[in-house]
UniProtKB/Swiss-Prot annotation:
InterPro entries: DTB_synth_BioD, P-loop_NTPase. Its cofactor is Mg(2+). GO terms for biological process: biotin biosynthetic process. It comes from Wolinella succinogenes (strain ATCC 29543 / DSM 1740 / CCUG 13145 / JCM 31913 / LMG 7466 / NCTC 11488 / FDC 602W) (Vibrio succinogenes). One of its GO terms (cellular component) is cytosol. This is ATP-dependent dethiobiotin synthetase BioD.
Length: 216
């Protein structure tokens, strides 16, 4: 079973929230998923997103005794890209270690949810990006998009990167409350004409979950 890699068109779009909703939905469908945030920046000192995933897994009795250090394999203080944050600390992201550990977790997950940091082209190394990590894992991408003005452009740039690498993906719309009314007017008409299905996280979670299970 392939892992699900949760990315987004940018920071603050809703990757962590989407990961948590998918974790709950998969659990309700009888699966035993794990959710990791292998790299987190802005962790000064606690990786807050990873902690939320661990707490939810503990609540659902899915954590398998994992520690926060296993949920978040690399953490950095500066809220920036992993490459910049690691460089500031005189460190370097250990991609080989990340891949090795994630493949190990994949074997004990049903399925494994991996939350990325930022968007697809966030650098882990100078010439190695978040999308490269997902591709190396042969993951199915869950791309969370925004309903704000400008969201279409951001989404299409991310889709172009995925399609260039011939990676499989599913689109998920995470609407903040203040975006719901404007989305129907400024963005929904375009997405209705696209060939891809755009799943709304607030109303189509169960169908999204079954679609993702079929994809992996």
């Amino acid at each position: 079973m392939k892992p699900l890699f949760i990315s987004a068109t940018g920071t603050g779009v809703g990757k962590s929230y989407t990961t948590q909703k998918l974790l709950q939905s998969l659990h309700q469908s009888g699966r035993k998923p794990l959710a990791l945030k292998p790299i987190e920046t802005g962790a000064n000192p606690t990786p807050e997103d990873a902690l939320l995933h661990l707490q939810l897994m503990q609540k659902l009795q899915l954590d398998q005794g994992l520690s926060l250090e296993e949920i978040c394999l690399e953490r950095y203080k500066l809220p920036a890209s992993p490459w910049v944050s690691a460089k500031k600390e005189g460190r370097c992201v250990d991609v080989d270690h990340l891949l090795r550990r994630l493949l190990e977790f994949q074997k004990r997950s049903d399925p494994l949810l991996i939350e990325g940091a930022g968007g697809l082209l966030v650098p882990l190394l100078k010439e190695y990006f978040m999308i490269d990590l997902a591709e190396a894992l042969e993951a199915h991408m869950v791309l969370v998009i925004s309903g704000k003005l400008g969201g279409i452009n951001e989404a299409l740039l991310s889709l172009e990167a995925l399609q260039h690498r011939q990676m499989s993906y599913t689109l998920v719309l995470n609407l903040w409350e203040e975006e719901k009314r404007s989305f129907e007017e400024i963005s929904a008409p375009y997405w209705k004409e696209r060939p891809e299905r755009l799943f709304r996280l607030d109303s189509e979670l169960e169908e999204l979950t079954q679609t993702l299970l079929s994809a992996i």
